[in-house]
């Protein structure tokens, strides 16, 4: 049968275990306002029993582990939805920033300027020889071109801003993955129970930030290490204690940054594989969304040039001259902007046209000869005074169907093409706004759920503290009783 000394060790184990558990409670209370902190729980277990004859005697209590209270599946869901939220936020912010200019319905808007241009031909048709009408028409044509080019440059500026952000975001991703790999090493090599909990919290916070930058998949190994890949699976960012950087290098084609991954000497282009997070949104904006709006402006410019030139042109001796619009790269008036430049291969004999090259808007200009001599504006088909047939025909093009091919979505009038652009812009703005709001609400709900599981509850900690205090007091009282018995034994037999 164990003696009084063994009983003292029983009481001592109780004191030590309650004190260790109280330290955990104190650590929780101290970090109640620490961002990303996960509350910890002291797990106590009975000591291994000893056998004396046929009787088992307990050996007290030990602190078996200190557990961080976390839901790993909830963390993974937060990583996934956070990437979607920041992606939607970035897309909405960018599209909303251009909506006031591109979707302007006032006098400086695309619709008003295109309408004013065709109205200029309508005015000219009422008095074809009127010099003031001709000068006014040229001013409206110039205003329309300037307006289109200004809108196009705005989109170019937005693309350049997105490209600049891509380089910075890639740097942030690499910094975070490097820090996560270092924490993986600390977590995997720590043998003291509970000693890696704070490192896990730091890693969780860093992974939250990483998910805001790029969509990721996270798998935790039995040793506690995170393996992180792009959500597409195309590239590994972190595995064990190693981080693999993304690289952003300028392309020789368009000068924009292209993102790639280099793992074990194998370079993989991941530009199109990154869909979510701030980085995915910036790539999407630069390469797809903003380019789509530019394509609509190009189609509109090509349609105007094609339709107006086909009516305004003059054929003398089999040579076509006197185009109203010209390419700025071919500034001589006899060349102008050839009407064939915009013909879609599938629609060359039909009424639809689309641009064959990007940046059509920036090349569009009024024929320099016409600018120098407004009398070259062709109002009629012949030399008869008052002939207004061509001016009237061009004026009617403004609302005529089948003048602009909208990127495979159908053939529209100029007014329809402008309306489609404004509608598309408005639809995308509202879509991204709705996605942003929905994702913010979802992530907020998930964060609240995480806080309810992993956050520090002061009422709960106060209750635990009182329970442990009573346990400590009871162990101390037990030791005091055993000490008294020991004194009595010594006094009784030590005389």
Where are these regions (language model features)?
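S/T-rich, low-complexity, solvent-exposed segments of bacterial secretion/appendage proteins
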Residues: 1-495
């Amino acid at each position: 049968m164990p003696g009084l000394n063994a009983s003292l060790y029983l009481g001592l184990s109780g004191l030590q275990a309650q004190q260790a558990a109280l330290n955990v409670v104190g650590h929780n209370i101290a970090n109640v306002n620490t961002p990303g902190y996960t509350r910890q729980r002291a797990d106590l277990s009975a000591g291994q029993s000893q056998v004396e004859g046929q009787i088992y005697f307990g050996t007290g209590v030990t602190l078996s582990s200190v557990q961080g209270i976390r839901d790993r599946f909830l963390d993974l869901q937060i990583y996934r939805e956070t990437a979607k939220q920041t992606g939607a936020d970035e897309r909405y912010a960018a599209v909303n920033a251009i909506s006031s200019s591109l979707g302007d319905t006032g006098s400086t808007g695309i619709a008003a300027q295109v309408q004013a241009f065709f109205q200029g031909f309508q005015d000219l048709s009422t008095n074809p020889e009127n010099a003031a009408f001709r000068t006014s028409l040229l001013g409206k044509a110039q205003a329309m071109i300037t307006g289109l080019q200004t809108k196009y440059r705005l989109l170019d500026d937005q693309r350049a801003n997105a490209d600049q952000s891509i380089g910075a975001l890639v740097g942030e991703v690499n910094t975070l993955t490097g820090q996560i790999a270092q924490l993986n090493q600390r977590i995997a090599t720590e043998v003291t129970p509970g000693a890696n909990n704070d490192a896990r919290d730091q890693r969780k916070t860093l992974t939250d930030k990483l998910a805001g930058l790029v969509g990721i998949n996270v798998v935790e190994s039995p040793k506690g290490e995170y393996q992180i890949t792009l959500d597409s699976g195309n590239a590994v960012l972190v595995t064990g204690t190693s981080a693999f950087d993304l690289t952003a290098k300028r392309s020789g084609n368009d000068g924009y940054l292209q993102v790639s991954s280099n793992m074990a000497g194998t370079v993989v282009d991941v530009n199109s594989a990154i869909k979510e997070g701030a980085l995915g949104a910036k790539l999407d904006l630069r390469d797809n969304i903003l380019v789509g709006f530019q394509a609509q402006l190009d189609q509109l410019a090509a349609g105007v040039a094609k339709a107006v030139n086909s009516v305004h042109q003059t054929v003398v001796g089999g040579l076509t001259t006197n185009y109203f619009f010209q390419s700025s790269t071919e500034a001589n008036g006899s060349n102008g902007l050839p009407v064939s430049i915009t013909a879609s291969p599938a629609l060359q004999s039909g009424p639809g046209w689309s641009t064959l090259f990007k940046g059509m808007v920036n090349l569009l200009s009024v024929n320099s000869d016409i600018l120098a001599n407004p009398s070259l504006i062709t109002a009629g088909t012949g030399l008869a005074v008052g002939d207004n047939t061509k001016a009237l025909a061009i004026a009617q093009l403004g609302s005529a169907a089948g003048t602009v091919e909208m990127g495979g979505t159908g053939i529209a009038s100029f007014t329809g093409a402008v309306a489609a652009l404004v509608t598309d812009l408005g639809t995308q703005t509202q879509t991204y706004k709705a996605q942003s709001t929905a994702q913010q609400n979802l992530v907020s709900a998930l964060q609240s759920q995480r806080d309810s599981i992993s956050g520090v509850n002061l009422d709960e900690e106060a209750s635990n503290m009182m329970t442990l205090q009573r346990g400590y007091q009871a162990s101390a009282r037990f030791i005091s009783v055993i000490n008294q018995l020991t004194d009595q034994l010594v006094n009784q037999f030590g005389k």
